[in-house]
Amino acid sequence: MGAGHSHDHPGGNERSLKIALALTGTFLIAEVVGGVMTKSLALISDAAHMLTDTVALAIALAAIAIAKRPADKKRTFGYYRFEILAAAFNALLLFGVAIYILYEAYLRLKSPPQIESTGMFVVAVLGLIINLISMRMLSSGQSSSLNVKGAYLEVWSDLLGSVGVIAGAIIIRFTGWAWVDSAIAVLIGLWVLPRTWILLKSSLNVLLEGVPDDVDLAEVEKQILATPGVKSFHDLHIWALTSGKASLTVHVVNDTAVNPEMEVLPELKQMLADKFDITHVTIQFELAPCEQADAAQHFNASPALVGSKSLAAGGN
């Protein structure tokens, strides 16, 4: 038997995240106050969206800090799931906020209040500037850090919301159509809901230890089987500790003519890292399928001996 392990360490630009968080968090308060003073539901709904930016930035920072904490005897996998729990909470909170905004917009469409378009415009422009600065701060790190990239995309999407509010303020200023404010709030709410569902679904998938969305299980099975020295495999499991940190365990039945630890293991580890970005790998080698080969069917991840070369050949 043999086992292979490799570990990666998360990184990120903490300084950029801290500056972006300070800017976004400060303006979030200003936007809520501005929305209340100008009676603009569009501003308030955009502030709700900016709240997700603030939480996303905080999660990214927390994930970097927590990732530095070593695993202990109680949490042998470390503390990576904190990020996922926070993301799931963020999604549930967003659902509630978006539904409230849609309901409030429905009431306002029937009786639109007087909107202070000038104040609405000024606050939205300031929000646009804050988003542009935050994007600039995060742009350098978003290509190398998944956390920073997620925060960058949150800020980018909120920037579009600010543009919508600015357009609404201009329309109200020159036409007096107060209903436009509620209409824009509805659009922002409808835009946020699908993204919220995607975030919640992805979080639940990680918590349920499902196969990561960016990993093609069938292709992994195919590539394992194609590795020289592999006769078959079973008990294959792929899951993620957190976003971008996939793990894999598998039982491999190896050819008796090869040394599995010296010949097969390096090939499998290299292939999984290069093609699927799976770097935390545990492989058990066997000369014949163990008793867990039948039990593996209960997981429905890959039926026992789904990777037999005879089956693969018949499928071509």
From Swiss-Prot:
Top-level taxon in the UniProt lineage: Bacteria
What induces or represses this gene? Most highly expressed when the upstream czcCBA transcript is not induced.
Keyword Cell wall biogenesis/degradation listed: no
Arranged from A to Z, the UniProt key words for this protein are: Cadmium, Cadmium resistance, Cell inner membrane, Cell membrane, Cobalt, Ion transport, Membrane, Plasmid, Transmembrane, Transmembrane helix, Transport, Zinc, Zinc transport
Phenotypic consequence of residue 158 to A/E: Lack of zinc resistance
User: What SUPFAM superfamilies has UniProt attached to this entry?
Assistant: Cation efflux protein cytoplasmic domain-like, Cation efflux protein transmembrane domain-like
Where, in residue ranges, is this chain on the Periplasmic side?
38-46, 103-114
**Gene3D superfamilies documented for this protein:** Cation efflux protein transmembrane domain
Question: Changing residue 53 to A/E/N: reported impact?
Answer: Hypersensitive to zinc
Is the keyword Zinc in the record? yes
Q: What is its main location?
A: membrane
Activity regulation summary: Efflux is inhibited by FCCP.
- Reported effect of changing residue 290 to S? Hypersensitive to zinc
**A biological-process GO annotation:** response to cadmium ion
Residue ranges, Cytoplasmic side = 1-16, 68-81, 136-151, 195-316
Gene Ontology cellular-component terms listed? plasma membrane
Swapping residue 31 to K leads to an effect described as: Lack of zinc resistance
Q: State what changing residue 251 to A does.
A: Decreases zinc resistance
* Membrane topology type: Multi-pass membrane protein
Gene deletion effect: Mutant is impaired in metal sensing. Deletion leads to partially constitutive expression of the Czc system due to an increased transcription of the czcCBA genes.
* Compartment(s): Cell inner membrane
Which stretches are transmembrane?
Answer: 17-37, 47-67, 82-102, 115-135, 152-172, 174-194
Under NCBIfam families, the record lists: CDF
Q: What does this protein do?
A: Mediates a low-level metal ion resistance, probably by efflux of cations from the cytoplasm into the periplasm. Also mediates resistance to cobalt, cadmium and zinc via regulation of the Czc system. May repress expression of the Czc system by an export of the inducing cations. Binds and transports zinc. Can also bind cobalt, copper and nickel.
Q: What is this protein called?
A: Metal cation efflux system protein CzcD
- Source organism (scientific name): Cupriavidus metallidurans (strain ATCC 43123 / DSM 2839 / NBRC 102507 / CH34)
